[in-house]
A protein has these predicted regions:
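Extracytoplasmic beta-rich repeat domains
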Residues: 7-9, 24-39, 48-51, 62-79, ...
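Conserved catalytic cores of soluble enzyme domains
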Residues: 174, 208
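Short loop/turn segments that connect beta-strands within beta-propeller blades
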Residues: 16-20, 56-60, 96-100, 136-140, ...
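Short loop/beta submotifs within extracellular cysteine-rich repeat domains
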Residues: 12, 22-23, 175, 185
Length: 208
């Protein structure tokens, strides 16, 4: 197997998992903070050069790139041949993995550093405009928006999905659970500091 990892110098490295030997490198135009994704026989990685890059997993050769209007900070979510990128340009973009063409885009109303969570034909993610969005991908529109009724704070954390809930951390020092269908608040849990990490759900529990 092969491990793919980006660095702050803007280089994506392919390393053999067995012995750690370098297989290839690919230089982008700026730092890489997103995790690479392998989908459809293609390595996808976003960068601060405002691009989503698609590379050959064996050679590192560029297959295509898609230029957005802002930095691509978060990891893409891939489903049914589409890479969903919620980026710093305030757009949720669906990019075809096969050829790098944009299928559609939906305005988010704010930039995001979170990776979209996909389930049931919807995408869920928070923004730096203090909102969490539930986006209907078939209708290509925002189904609901959540904003805390008293506090204003960004959602940097990527969401986890389970038991009909969207669970993510907020910079208000709380973990928030929202109803996935309606976006209404289900519960919150207070922590001692802002929650930028992404929750994981297993065995009926949330770990963060």
């Amino acid at each position: 197997g092969t491990v793919y990892v980006g660095d702050l110098a803007g280089v994506l490295h392919a390393v053999a998992a067995q012995d750690g030997k370098a297989a290839w490198t690919f230089k982008t135009g700026a730092e890489i903070r997103a995790s690479p994704v392998v989908a459809g026989g293609t390595v996808l990685v976003g960068g601060y050069d405002n691009r989503l890059h698609a590379l050959d997993p064996k050679t590192g050769a560029s297959r295509w790139f898609f230029e957005t209007d802002g930095q691509v900070h978060a990891t893409s979510a891939v489903d049914a041949g589409l890479a969903y990128v919620a980026g710093c340009d305030g757009e949720l973009r669906a990019i075809r993995v096969a050829d790098g063409k944009q299928a559609f885009s939906i305005p988010s109303g704010g930039y995001t550093g979170a990776s979209p969570a996909l389930q049931g034909g919807r995408a869920f993610y928070g923004t730096f405009e203090d909102e969490v969005l539930g986006v209907d991908l078939e209708a290509r529109k925002v189904a609901w928006r959540y904003q805390h009724p008293q506090r204003r704070f960004p959602f940097y954390s990527s969401a986890a999905l389970g038991d009909g809930k969207v669970v993510l951390g907020g910079r208000d020092k709380h973990v928030h659970a929202l109803d996935a269908a309606t976006g209404k608040a289900a519960w919150t849990f207070a922590t001692r500091a802002r929650v930028d990490s992404s929750p994981a759900i297993a065995g009926g529990r949330v770990f963060v």
